[in-house]
């Protein structure tokens, strides 16, 4: 029996095959916004996340326009949008809607395994593409990262353990994302940020922490570890006061 990640990647292969049948990438170039610039100060990347394999439905009927507008008003430095439909109940339409509403950098959060998905994300308005080391061979990761650069976009290269980190460092990417969630089991351990962050600080690389940040105390932990930003989804999608969450993010360490 495969892991959750294996199931997701199998589904992506089907989606990619369908895209090649139904989608023709546009050639026009457009203006993009920089996450690297946003990370010059500690930044919250606020996520639109309707559901997940581990939690089921989180906020299925969220008004994407309203959510994104609130994020921007509260001080988010970037917005992340889940575009996976099968497991996270997102869509490229959600990404496009966010782009229409937002003037800050926009991350396409998906399991990218092929260039055509990057083309689709670009057309929908993404500025940043997530590339997950655990979902790709070294060769494919390098190929997709090069394509991101060719499109004039930025990448977050996501890692969960030391082995994946070594692969990511070789690319010298724009941003490395430490995912505190193990994509094989979907369990979360915030100490991954502290463990892997030490190496990234030594390498003087730009990095963020992803998943598992729910409180002021969690925010202090990731800031102390040296993260330049944090990606927050579930905590914001279920929050009764997004404004209060952002105020808590302003803690000094």
From Swiss-Prot:
Top EC group: lyase
UniProt lineage: Bacteria, Bacillati, Bacillota, Bacilli, Bacillales
Name of the protein described by the UniProt record: Indole-3-glycerol phosphate synthase
Pathway info: Amino-acid biosynthesis; L-tryptophan biosynthesis; L-tryptophan from chorismate: step 4/5
Transmembrane region(s): none
PANTHER family: INDOLE-3-GLYCEROL-PHOSPHATE SYNTHASE (PTHR22854:SF2), TRYPTOPHAN BIOSYNTHESIS PROTEIN (PTHR22854)
Reactions catalysed according to its record: 1-(2-carboxyphenylamino)-1-deoxy-D-ribulose 5-phosphate + H(+) = (1S,2R)-1-C-(indol-3-yl)glycerol 3-phosphate + CO2 + H2O
Pfam families with a match to the protein in the record: IGPS
Family: Belongs to the TrpC family.
Taxonomic superkingdom: Bacteria
CDD domains, alphabetized: IGPS
GO biological process, one term: L-tryptophan biosynthetic process
EC number: 4.1.1.48
Keywords annotated in UniProt: Amino-acid biosynthesis, Aromatic amino acid biosynthesis, Decarboxylase, Lyase, Tryptophan biosynthesis
GO molecular function: indole-3-glycerol-phosphate synthase activity; phosphoribosylanthranilate isomerase activity
